[in-house]
Design a protein with these regions (language model features):
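Conserved phosphate-binding catalytic cores of ATP/NTP-utilizing and phosphoryl-transfer enzymes
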Residues: 1, 101, 105-126
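Conserved phosphate-binding/catalytic loops in two-lobed NTP-binding clefts
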Residues: 105-106, 266-289
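Glycine-rich beta-strand-to-loop/alpha-helix junction loops that act as flexible
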Residues: 75-78, 95, 131, 249-258
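N-terminal beta-alpha supersecondary unit
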Residues: 2-79, 108
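A short helix-loop
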Residues: 8-9, 26, 122-123, 128-131, ...
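Glycine-rich phosphate-binding/hydrolytic loop that grips phosphoryl groups
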Residues: 279-318, 322
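Low-acidity, Ser/Thr- and Arg-rich intrinsically disordered low-complexity segments
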Residues: 330-353, 364-365, 376-388
């Protein structure tokens, strides 16, 4: 059984193809980069409409399959930007109707959880979901993925992008912050807004811009922003783990690619006697493979959708989805996509003061590609029939 997934919640149009065992045969994407300013939903949607057919073709070519080999198609139903979601949904509907195959709309946030579980071998984690539009701490409880904490204003990724524009870094500023922070030498106190398991970031933008106007180097601002924001995320994640009794923590979302965030969460997990998991970078960011995998899980657990059921939902919370597949499928843990993170670089934020040395950030190289026989896996996937 081969499933194609189409991701289109925000700036990325991604298409992935997976089989019933979460072997990823292709994971292609094209990212919209605004010429200036921030992300405009309609401009991003126009970009997605222009590249969708090409990305779908590229994904099938890389997987070595054609349209007739796809048994199921899934797409990101939400949450996300309405115009972008509609492009992905339209492409999926057209493919499903043309090929007369089933279609499944999935929750984008849950897709991050499930691809992480499948590829790292963790079984029942608390998820720190740190992305552009969302920042949440999520865990499975009573048949659904419950949100135990979240941002009260903007997502961590949006905060970094907005601050990056204000500081002249351009759009998609997260990687720039990570690079600059490694060169920083002083930590400056910024608003630390944590209430229970919720966080807020907007005050940090105002304070960081004020530091910039005072002549504080960008490197020190980046260091201070990362340390403060990531300490907040680590604190609420630890509080949620204690509250719900989880011994595993999974990172997901685009900001989970940041080496310093990984280091801080890993250090916290070790201190609690827990374990941290994180998939390869390509599965942290928005991607089609995670959409395909969740669609396959849902279909194999009995979920069915008509075309009339595939209306997109800009606001679509994880706890609105009944997670039937966790009752119907046992997981066979695969090797983690990343090595364990060393905690020797970690340092408690509370011990830092202006003028102290910064903690070191960690840059992770991508793992070596899998060595499984590609053709054999494709043949096996093709031989697996759809569930009735």
């Amino acid at each position: 059984m081969l499933t194609m997934g189409i991701e289109g919640t925000a700036h990325t149009l991604g298409v992935g193809i997976v089989d019933q065992d979460c072997n990823v045969f292709s994971n292609e994407l094209d990212m919209f980069r605004p010429p200036q300013g921030g992300l405009h939903p309609r401009e991003a949607a126009n970009h997605h409409a222009e590249v969708a057919a090409d990305i779908m073709t590229r994904a099938m070519d890389k997987a070595g399959v054609g349209p007739k080999d796809i048994d199921l198609i899934s797409f990101s139903m939400g949450p996300g930007l309405g115009p972008c979601l509609r492009v992905a949904a339209t492409a999926a509907r057209a493919f499903a109707c043309t090929r007369n195959i089933p279609i499944i709309g999935v929750n984008h946030c849950i897709a991050h959880i499930e691809i992480g579980r499948a590829l790292t071998g963790c079984r029942d984690p608390a998820l720190l979901y740190a992305s552009g539009g969302n920042t949440q701490v999520i865990a499975f409880a009573e048949g659904r993925y419950r949100i135990f904490g979240e941002t009260q204003d903007i997502g961590i990724g949006n905060m970094l992008d907005k601050l990056g524009r204000d500081l002249g870094m351009g759009f998609y500023a997260g990687p720039v912050f990570e690079k600059l922070a490694k060169e920083g030498s002083k930590y400056y106190e910024l608003p630390y807004s944590v209430k229970g398991m919720d966080v807020a970031f907007s005050g940090m933008i105002t304070a960081a811009v004020a530091l910039h106007k005072k002549g504080v180097p960008l490197e020190d601002i980046a260091l201070s922003v990362q340390e403060t924001a990531f300490a907040m995320l680590t604190e609420v994640t630890e509080r949620a783990m204690a509250h719900i009794g989880k011994k595993e923590v999974l990172l997901g979302g685009g900001v989970a690619q940041n080496g310093r965030l990984r280091d801080m969460v890993e250090d916290m997990a070790h201190a609690r006697g827990a374990e941290m998991f994180v998939p390869d970078r390509q599965y942290c960011r928005d991607n089609g493979a995670m959409i395909a995998w969740l669609g396959a899980e849902m279909y194999n657990s009995g979920v069915r959708m008509d075309i009339s059921d595939t209306v997109v939902r800009q606001r679509f919370r994880t706890d609105e989805v009944e997670v039937g597949w966790r009752r119907s499928r046992s997981y066979l843990p695969s090797a983690s996509c990343l090595p364990r993170i060393s905690s020797r670089f970690s340092r408690n934020l509370s011990t830092m003061s202006e003028g102290t040395d910064p903690p070191a950030a960690i840059l992770w190289p991508p793992p070596a590609p899998p060595t499984d026989a590609h053709a054999s896996r494709i043949a096996t996937a093709r031989s697996m029939p759809l569930s009735s």
